[in-house]
């Protein structure tokens, strides 16, 4: 699947006239046998790799694609599965890579708006490229069987009764 994903990413960048360089890592291979919090470990390792590559290229920021819905899902997941109340921040100063920042430019953009924009521009995005997602028998190789997907469905169901649910979750940690 790696080559298929890479081709899709390169095609999107070409359509948007964005110069892109793709780097290969062995992070997925490293975490595949981890049983305790593999997703957390993988995310941390990928972020560290991005910081290192950005610095190598003379950059002082990395931009991640987290959007509004990711933020509220993460808040609820932390509460339900981690017994904690915290949020993603739109901008962070790295504690491990001095002088580096992480930004989330889509922080206030709803996922549905991103999907509509992508469809309008005939762009096709990949799902998580991780082996846990690929091999998920209960979700057919998508993220549909994940805790995040469960929380996404819960929020959607609650929004049907109260259209302010998403904004209220977001504002609850401001």
Predicted features and spans:
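A short glycine-/small-residue-rich loop at the edge of a beta-strand within enzyme catalytic domains
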Residues: 41, 63, 105, 109, ...
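Conserved active-site and cofactor/substrate-binding residues in soluble primary-metabolism enzymes
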Residues: 45, 146, 164
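An accessory alpha-helical subdomain
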Residues: 150-174
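ATP-dependent adenylation/nucleotidyltransferase module used to activate substrates
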Residues: 2-85, 89, 112-120
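Catalytic subdomain that performs nucleotidyl-dependent activation
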Residues: 69-155
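Residue-level detector of family-conserved "landmark" positions at structurally sensitive sites
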Residues: 22-23, 64, 127-130, 135, ...
């Amino acid at each position: 699947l790696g080559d298929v994903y890479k081709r899709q990413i390169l095609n999107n960048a070409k359509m948007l006239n964005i110069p892109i360089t793709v780097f290969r890592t062995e992070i997925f291979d490293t975490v595949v046998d981890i049983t305790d919090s593999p997703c957390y470990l993988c995310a941390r390792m990928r972020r560290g790799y991005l910081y290192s590559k950005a610095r190598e290229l003379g950059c002082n920021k990395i931009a991640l694609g987290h959007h509004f819905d990711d933020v509220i899902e993460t808040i609820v997941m932390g509460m339900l599965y981690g017994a904690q109340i915290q949020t993603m921040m739109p901008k962070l100063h790295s504690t491990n890579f001095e002088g580096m920042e992480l930004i989330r430019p889509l922080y206030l953009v709803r996922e549905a708006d991103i999907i509509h924009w992508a469809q309008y521009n005939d762009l096709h995005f990949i799902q998580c490229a991780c082996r846990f997602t690929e091999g998920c028998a209960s979700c057919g190789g998508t993220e549909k069987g994940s805790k995040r997907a469960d929380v996404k469905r819960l929020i959607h169901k609650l929004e049907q009764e109260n259209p302010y649910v998403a904004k209220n979750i977001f504002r609850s940690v401001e």
